[in-house]
Structure formats: C-alpha cells, structure tokens
Amino acid sequence: MLAIALPSYPISNFRPGRLLALAALLSVPLCAHAGRAYVTNEDGESVSVLDTDKAEVVSTINVGKRPRGLKLSRDGRELYVAVSGLPKCPPSVPDEECAKLKRDLTADGIAVIDTATLKLVRLLKSGSDPEQFDLSHDGKRLFISNEDSGTLTVVNVRTGAVETTVAVGREPEGVRLSPDARWIIVTSESGNAIYVIDAHSLKVVKSIAVGKRPRDVAFSPDSKTVYISGEFDASVFTTKIPDSDGATKLIQLRTEDKPMGLIFDAPRNRLFVSTGRRGAIAVVSIEGPKLEAEIPVGARPWGIALSRDGKRLYSANGSSNDVTIVDTTTLQVVKKIAVGKSPWGVVLDDRRG
C-alpha cells in the first residue's frame, strides 16, 4: 500500500499550482505493487505469490482443498480460486470406485483473496467440484464448471448468490467467455464435446462433438473461431461460432502429448499448448497450420499464462513442483521457480501504475 503524507497547513494557504501538484500526487494508484504471478498448488492446498520482477516466491496463501482454476478481478483487487472437497480421481479409476471416495462438499466453492493483504476473505458457493471458470467482462459474474455434477454455475460476485445453473456434459472443465461477451464455451471431458451457451439468455445453443477428452478453450480476437485441446488424441481442434455444427482437427501433435492449457497469441497468430506428461509447451502456427517449436519446461505442464506485453509465457508444472518462464521471442526457458506441491494453474497481474 502506498502511503501519502499530506501537508499540515490550512487549505487556504494553497496556491493553484500547489493544488494541481497535490491532485497529481493523489492520482497515484494506492494499490500499486510489483508485477505478480499467482499459482495454485493442488496438493499443497495453497497459492504461491511470485514477484515477476525478481522471479521469486514472496508469499504463500493457504486457500482450501484442491485449488485449481484461478482468475483476477478486473481491477486486480481480488483473486478468485476454485477449491474442491472431492479427492483426486484420475481417468484410469472406474467411476464406481471414484464414487466411493470420501468428499467434503463444504469445501467446494470459489475462494476470494484480497490481493492487498493476501488474505482469504470469503468463499463463494458453487456446484460440486468446481474446476475452471471465467469472469464476465463487467466483473459481476463468475461462470463456473462443476466437474462432479456436470453443470455450469453462474454466481453473482458481490452477493455470492447462485443466479442460475446450466446442465452441460459430463465432467465439464474448460470455460471461456468470448471477447465480445456473446458466447460461453464449456468443454465436456467425458462427453467428448463442447457446449455453446448464449451469454445473454444463459441457455445452451448447441453441443459440438470434439475429439477425445477436450480440456481447454481459446477464442480468436474476433470471437468467431474457437480452439480446443484434445487430451486423449493429442490434437488441437477448431470450430466456428455460432454457425458450425462440427469441429475439425487443426493439428495433430506427437502421440505422447496430452494437450491441456491453451493460449492464443494474437499478434503472432499462434497457439501455446501445454502437453501434460510430455513435459513441453507446443507452439502452433495457425498459418499452415504447423508446429513451430516444442519447449521443454518441466514435468506435466498444465496451466499457462501470457504476460500483457506478450514477451513472457508462464507454465505451471504439476509433477516438478515449479513454474517455468519462457521468452516468447527466442522460445527459450529463462527461469524456473520452485513453488508448492502440484502446481495446477497460473494467472498474472502485470499492470503497472
């Protein structure tokens, strides 16, 4: 927090020039801080706070069980983190065995952290086993995928009220609001489909079959093209919204790849794709399309984030318990930072002043 010492003499003594200088001083943001990255540690039940200038961990926040998806509020004053009381159950475990695992439904929700104090201030309730979510452009609503219940929950950020619940496919994960705020896309892992939701009516418009186990979604800047990672067929798919009723394979990656996180790098017209157990970030040029590069980053990269200026890519590496920073011009690793246990997602706050 930035403290400002005000003059102690009477306001009548101020000249116009002094008043203008004081006004300029008071316009300095009161919450200015160094650039930060926030990283969820799924098995560590915490969020690591990184100073991106120094490339080091400066704080750790205990946040709740199984923190995964995370987003910053539009003004950067709050950090939202999806937490879940449902134990891990990988795809190799039968559904009937997963159903026997002990769960704590009271732990489910979206944890809200004050970024000035780095304290947990409240828990917004959602559906069962929230995993990923997106934030409305006005910052008033969260759109939350609930993996266990096959639903999308719409939550009012201010009141905490659940405004509506939308049935989607089995094991929803990726959630993305289009840049024009017209569409919400939700991936259904087990349903091998994406669901297209009208963001105004909050009704499902259609579902589109997409490969095997779609995980994450990215939009083109014009909101017309959607890119989807297909984990079990090592591919990236694409479709047109809202007209298309099908998806096409954009590119086939290596068979050992397990695509998860997606980011569209608009200035360079390319995608960054985390490949899970393959331990790399795939760089895919939309032109062609073609595989530009593969960047080894760590064990099981999952969530990824791109800096505001597009110069740095951050990768949360779940099995090596670290975050990797990549120079997006040279496509070389510039730094690795140890964080908590099983980092899952990362989000950046690199606004200045």
For each predicted feature, which ranges?
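Bacterial N-terminal signal peptides that target proteins for export
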Residues: 4-21
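Predominantly soluble domains enriched in secretory-pathway, periplasmic, or organellar proteins
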Residues: 25-353
